From Swiss-Prot:
An accommodation pocket formed by Phe-324, Tyr-237 and Ile-283 at subsite -1 (cleavage subsite) contributes to the methyl-galactose tolerance of BpGH86A. Its EC number is 3.2.1.178. It comes from Phocaeicola plebeius (strain DSM 17135 / JCM 12973 / CCUG 54634 / M2) (Bacteroides plebeius). Substrate binds at residues 53, 76, 78, 87, 114, 151, 235, 279, 326, 331. Pfam families: BPA_C (PF18040), CBM_4_9 (PF02018), Porphyrn_cat_1 (PF18206). Cleaves the sulfated polysaccharide porphyran at the (1->4) linkages between beta-D-galactopyranose and alpha-L-galactopyranose-6-sulfate, forming mostly the disaccharide alpha-L-galactopyranose-6-sulfate-(1->3)-beta-D-galactose. Some longer oligosaccharides of even number of residues are also observed. Inactive on the non-sulfated agarose portion of the porphyran backbone. Can also use methylated galactoses. Residues 1-22 form the signal peptide. This is Beta-porphyranase A. Disulfide bonds: none annotated.
Length: 728
């Protein structure tokens, strides 16, 4: 590998051209020749996302659905404490298990139990309770992969019947968890087979009470039981789950919720323990009960998709996630419930008063699974200029999947870009799922002749584009790593700088961003001065999801992109300063995405001239922005721009850019070895209008790349969207 350089030289004018790449537009860029990794993981693991709350794979209808849609089992309410109470009818008293010394099989689902007085009570011996769970499972032929001992326990800490109430009851519940984890891990027949997770937080409003809720719930749980847990479980809902206010967690709030757990896990244990999202979705409060309705019961599907995009970015640190969809839920279809189905049910009976003689049909929740049916493969590099447009992309051999989700409250137009202009993409199918609040789910599949230049997407709509692609091989990789600070939950004082150190950073060619999570009054500033190793960077005015104006406290993650060249290998520091006081910075995480084969940096000039070195004594170089927010490089006279690039010898590279020229100006692109003078040259011109230009060349040892625009002093040229990538 050798160092290469790019130069851009041209003429300059004060006129601002209409750009073809507009920062004010929703730009989604897909590079399906670059494989994307989350740490060491690239392939989509469907078993972590597409599950239902059922273990009834032996049911004919359920089994067919699981097979047809590639869906897994999720969660079941049954475990050692339900079994014990059925035998002894006394909480804290456990029966003698029949010894079993045969092989233990593991089934992938979560076993959990209700926080009832039959299972836990003040005064119980938590060590005996933990020992019983290990005895129960070690003498079972089949065990669940995950055990979440109590479902949403803390919101029931004041329930009638408990002899201990409030925080004392929550601490007892945590010690109950810790004992279970300790005894299961210490049992040689279970250790390595079962994972204990908790605490199944129903209401993860960490910011409440100036983060007292965090300190007395999840932090307390991690401090007292975290060492015995394999992972931490949280429930994510839009709407009200048991308690709280009717707000949206999808978007920046859920990002901040999970980032805080990860950040403290790193501080406490030196590594991040995995997450389990054992329930997620949306809760509709328009009905007084939990009975099924064709309209209100399917509104949760938009939330399924909103949260799913968040969780897909966490696969490397995720055990499992389960949208809140059950199977037939026959337990709910009783005379007491007027023979209605459960709101979360996926199957509806034609003859509810005689379940032994009925036909079951899938309701419209099936379209969530239809939308994602057969989506699989390796992640590919995809970016969105608007955080409200969530994106994912995968390639499975010659099949490409591009997924878009709209978190915004308004319709959006998304422009789809690809460095090859989609030339090797064909047979495009557009899958669309839209949740109409008053009419239910509208699902369509449409064949389109080619990849659309732009696509419209309304609120609560998710689109999956499925296409054939002839270039099935990957020519580059981009690896995303997260780095966690030793500091978190720092109070904000007006004008006082907060410092967050990071160690072990590996920088390079690629992208970088700061995941800044804050909890402060909704009227307070969300735009501090942020410095990366002493250099100030721009903080955006937009973040994922809504503005949280219906909350007293804004709690959300704001992603701050910056030039990766501001990072150093090794130790780095982030400093932030707010102009006003109040609230906390809850977590700060550095996200670095690094190419294995180096590429040009800041080819869209979104960060001004950063990463580019101006050249020449007889001209001027600058970046100008038009009224629509389009950034382009403007170069005058005998001047230019240079950027060093790492390239590999023996590979074919493609240089591409969008160029506009005036007068007799020509774009001259030179590939030059600075030590030997070896030169490869191409010339292009595009008077008056932007034109996409490109060429391929073979790299040799110590070759240097130079891009030069004409040296005429009285003409003008603009350049944007510069890309240099290997093709083999």
């Amino acid at each position: 590998m050798s160092y290469k350089y790019i130069f851009l030289l041209s003429a300059f004018t004060l006129g601002v051209p209409p750009g073809i790449y507009c920062q004010g537009r929703n730009e989604v860029v897909v590079d399906y020749n670059t494989r994307r990794f989350l740490s060491g993981v690239s392939e989509l693991d469907r078993s972590k996302y597409f599950n239902i709350h059922s273990t009834s794979d032996d049911d004919k209808d359920v089994g067919k659905f699981l097979a047809d849609y590639q869906v897994g089992l999720g969660r079941k309410f049954w475990g050692p404490y339900s079994y014990a109470y059925n035998k002894t009818h006394e909480v804290g008293k456990y029966p003698q298990m029949k010894p079993y010394s045969g092989n233990i099989s593991v089934k992938r689902y979560i076993a959990t139990e209700h926080p009832y007085v039959q299972h836990i009570q003040g005064g119980i011996d938590v060590q005996a309770a933990g020992a019983w769970s290990a005895e129960y499972y070690s003498n079972s032929e089949l065990v669940p992969e995950f055990f979440e001992p109590l479902n949403e326990p803390f919101v029931h800490a004041n329930d009638a019947g408990f002899t201990v109430q409030g925080q004392a009851m929550r601490e007892l519940m945590v010690d109950f968890y810790a004992s279970i984890g300790k005894h299961i891990h210490n049992n040689p027949r279970l250790n390595g087979k079962m994972k204990v997770i908790g605490y199944a937080a129903a209401y993860p409003a960490w910011e409440d009470g100036n983060f007292n809720y965090w300190n007395t719930r999840m932090k307390m749980f991690i401090d007292r039981a975290g060492a015995y847990m394999d992972g931490f479980s949280v429930h994510l809902y839009d709407g009200i789950n048991v308690t709280g206010t009717d707000t949206k967690r999808s978007g920046s709030n859920s990002e901040a919720v999970l980032d805080m757990v990860e950040a403290y896990s790193y501080i406490k244990f030196g590594h991040v323990k995995p997450l389990a999202i054992s329930e997620f979705g949306g809760i509709d409060n328009s009905k007084p009960d939990d009975s099924y309705d064709d309209i209100s019961s399917v509104r949760s599907v938009s939330s399924f998709n909103h949260f799913l995009f968040n969780l897909m970015e966490r696969q490397d640190n995720l055990f499992i996630s389960i949208p809140f969809v059950s199977d037939k839920a026959e337990w709910h279809i009783t005379a007491a419930n007027n023979y209605t189905s459960y709101s979360a049910a996926l199957f509806i009976p034609d003859n509810p008063q005689n379940l032994k003689n009925t036909t079951w049909r899938l309701n419209d929740k099936k379209y969530f699974f239809e939308l994602w049916k057969n989506v699989k493969g390796e992640r590919v590099d995809i970016t969105s200029s608007n955080p409200d447009i969530q994106v994912q992309a995968f390639k499975d051999g010659g099949r490409l999947y591009i997924a878009l989700d709209n978190l915004d409250d308004n319709p959006q137009t998304v422009y789809l870009n690809n460095k090859n202009s989609w030339k090797d993409v064909s047979n495009v199918t557009k899958r669309s799922l839209y949740v109409n609040y008053n009419a239910g789910i509208e699902y369509t599949e449409q064949n389109v002749p080619s990849m659309p230049e732009s696509i419209s997407i309304v609120p609560n709509q998710t689109i999956v584009l499925v296409a054939d692609v002839s270039s099935s091989a990957f020519t580059n990789s981009i690896i995303r790593n997260k780095y966690y600070s030793s500091e978190y939950l720092k109070p904000i004082s007006a004008g006082s700088s907060l410092s967050f150190p990071f160690t072990g950073i590996e920088s390079g060619s690629g992208r970088a961003s700061l995941r800044m999570s804050i909890g402060r009054p909704v009227s307070a500033s969300k735009k501090p001065v942020v410095k990366i190793n002493g250099t100030a960077v721009s903080v955006p005015d937009n973040w994922k999801g809504y503005g949280q104006s219906n909350r007293n406290i804004f709690f959300g993650m704001i992603e701050v992109p910056f030039d990766i060249q501001l990072l150093k290998n090794g130790d780095n520091n982030v400093d932030i300063t707010f102009s006003d006081g109040g609230g906390h910075v809850s977590s700060m995480i550095l996200q670095v995405e690094k190419y294995t084969v180096s590429t040009l940096q800041n080819g869209t000039f979104s960060e001004g001239l950063s990463a580019w070195q101006p050249l020449g004594n007889y001209g001027t170089v600058c970046v100008q922005t038009d009224n629509a927010g389009n950034n382009v490089a403007c170069i005058s006279g005998h001047a230019g721009l240079m950027q060093r690039v790492d390239m590999e010898s023996g590979r074919t590279y493609r240089f591409s850019a969008d160029v506009k020229t005036e007068g007799a100006c020509k774009l001259k692109v030179m590939l030059q070895d600075m030590s030997t003078g070896t030169v490869y040259t191409e010339e292009f011109s595009s008077p008056g209008n932007y034109k996409a230009v490109s060429f391929d060349f073979n790299s040799t040892v110590k070759k240097v790349v130079c891009a030069i625009v004409c040296e005429r002093q009285n003409d003008a040229a603009w350049i944007d969207n510069i890309v240099l990538l290997p093709q083999n």
